[in-house]
């Protein structure tokens, strides 16, 4: 795992006792937000790189269809807008964030294998480990904040059947284009939800969605 992701073990020591010092919780929230921002940035870069690799004619065809139609994670009950997000509890938003991350375990493994020789993943080594690391941090936050009292079906073993590794035709190209668009969208959601939960507990100047 990359050295930049070795902070969790130090921070998690504070959770072994009953009382959690505010500064430790603040640092844990800050680390989670920073990691979510990093993953969202990576997702956007990978998406742009894929767009640049598409032939002009294929790109014109793809532009006629929404790449976000039928995202795999649509089955996860995420808030649909700013107002609904603000209405949800911190625990709920953390639980939803964890579910979104877990839903990408299989697709990201497949995606990484498919584009292992591409510049698309040249700047995102260990992206799977980064997802796992962020999820561990969110789970530790839920030990303190709670999980919103909601049950979400385990999404780790589900499969993203629309993913086409071999890009055999335009249909396969569209599937992969859609997959990357969905990944970017979901990482943006996770970043947003973590920012909201942090801002509620530690009043900051930038709390807007």
Swiss-Prot record:
Growth hormone plays an important role in growth control and is involved in the regulation of several anabolic processes. Implicated as an osmoregulatory substance important for seawater adaptation. The gene is gh1. It comes from Anguilla japonica (Japanese eel). One of its GO terms (molecular function) is growth hormone activity. Its main location: secreted. This is Somatotropin-1. Keywords: Disulfide bond, Hormone, Metal-binding, Secreted, Signal, Zinc. SUPFAM superfamilies: 4-helical cytokines. Zn(2+) binds at residues 38, 191.
